[in-house]
């Protein structure tokens, strides 16, 4: 169960980083 939460958080972090990169690399 903890692993599911960790993997979900890591997926969220990856998505946030990708989104931030898109906006900062105009």
Curated annotation (Swiss-Prot):
Disulphide-bonded residues: none
Location(s) in or outside the cell: Secreted; Host cell membrane
MF GO annotations: toxin activity
Pfam family, one: Delta_lysin
Modified sites of kind N-formylmethionine: 1
Principal location class: secreted
GO biological-process terms attached to the record: symbiont-mediated hemolysis of host erythrocyte
InterPro entries the UniProt entry points to: Delta_lysin
Record field: transmembrane: none
Keywords per UniProt: Cytolysis, Formylation, Hemolysis, Host cell membrane, Host membrane, Membrane, Secreted, Toxin, Transmembrane, Virulence
GO CC annotation, single: host cell plasma membrane
Record function comment: Lyses erythrocytes and many other mammalian cells.
Family listed: Belongs to the delta-lysin family.
Protein's name according to its UniProt entry: Delta-hemolysin
Highest classification ranks of the organism: Bacteria, Bacillati, Bacillota, Bacilli, Bacillales
